[in-house]
């Protein structure tokens, strides 16, 4: 995976929510662009979402690259919200990338920027613990302050 000359540590961490039912899907999302087509905005995460999405349908390939993909759907409402890169192709691995293989369509999810421990500053990816994804629904609740932002 090529992250040389690429830095993502200054990117904001987002809580990702399903646009259809408002379910929190991940607490460590990042705004990103599709490697094969940088005009396409999306969100991504590095840790598999727990108890919020599941695979749906069969694996597929796109005409843009040779990555093997599989759609993921929100467990609460059933809508397709993104896809998982099951097997990344060498072209994408050699491109400047953030190492994330869980992708969320910007038409299906929205992001809420997270605040750091002080509650004042935005939480940046470089300050995020490596294994933070939680499964406890109470900790995934979005505070009123974050909704207002």
UniProtKB/Swiss-Prot annotation:
InterPro entries in the cross-refs: YPEH2ZP
Location within or outside the cell: Cytoplasm; Mitochondrion
GO biological process, one term: positive regulation of apoptotic process
One Pfam family hit: YPEH2ZP
GO cellular component annotations of the record: cytosol; membrane; mitochondrion
Biological function: May play a role in the regulation of cellular reactive oxygen species metabolism. May participate in cell growth regulation.
Family: Belongs to the FAM72 family.
Oligomer and partners: Interacts with UNG.
Protein name: Protein FAM72A
Underlying gene: Fam72a
């Amino acid at each position: 995976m090529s992250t040389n000359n690429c830095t993502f540590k200054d990117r904001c961490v987002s809580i990702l929510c399903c646009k259809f039912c408002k379910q929190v899907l991940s607490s460590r999302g990042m705004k990103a662009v599709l490697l094969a087509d940088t005009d396409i905005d999306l969100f991504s995460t590095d840790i598999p979402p727990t108890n919020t999405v599941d695979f749906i349908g069969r694996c597929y390939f796109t005409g843009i690259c040779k990555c093997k993909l599989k759609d993921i759907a929100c467990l609460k409402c059933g809508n397709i919200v993104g896809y998982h890169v099951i097997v990344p192709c060498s072209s994408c691995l050699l491109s400047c990338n953030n190492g994330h293989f869980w992708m969320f369509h910007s038409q299906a999810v929205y992001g809420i920027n997270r605040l750091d421990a002080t509650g004042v500053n935005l939480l940046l990816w470089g300050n995020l613990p490596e294994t933070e994804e939680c499964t406890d629904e109470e900790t995934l609740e979005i505070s009123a302050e974050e909704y207002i932002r």
